[in-house]
Amino acid sequence: MQIVKSNGNPLPFPQNPLPNKLIGFKRIQIIYIDQNVVAFLRRFRRIFAICAIDLIIITENVRISEFVVLNIWPMLRDSIRSIILNTVAFRRLRQLAPTMLTDCPSLRFVMSNDDIFSEFLIDNSAMASDCQAVAKWLFTPRSDGLPKWFRCSVNSPADQWSSTMEQLKMAFSNASSPVTFFIVLKLSSTLIGSVVPFF
């Protein structure tokens, strides 16, 4: 493992404790992960506790997702402000931590370039679909009242799309507490003509 500057030059891996004057970082990009990386990240726990973290997990490797949940997620969870996931990573993370979204008190933005907007029944159990877990997170109010954002692509057939929108309307009608959120959908060309006013 090595640390590399943005210009590609490797830096020595630090062995000493982090200096107290270090109060944050702009970006940490991890391409390879093992216990050495986890040990290095643990030295940043003080900073993770005071920073807003924008986390991106794009992997097709199930074992990497499992490693992230077991070793890195507990360190970052309370400070994650936004998370970008692909379907494989999201599904595996949720298998290991079904309530991963609602367990992040600072989380305001969830994005996936994959289609996980297939049904809008609110559920947070281990057996819930990815979309049901997102629905549960969206309808769980933040303590500060700030709105949440969810963004994904939609490639569903038109009839499934209509059913999902009806479920979303019903969820709004049945909400037990006021919530504010935005949903941004990137529709496939076949669905553009299916868009109708929400109410």
What are these model-predicted stretches?
Residues 1-199:
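The conserved beta-strand core of Leucine-Rich Repeat
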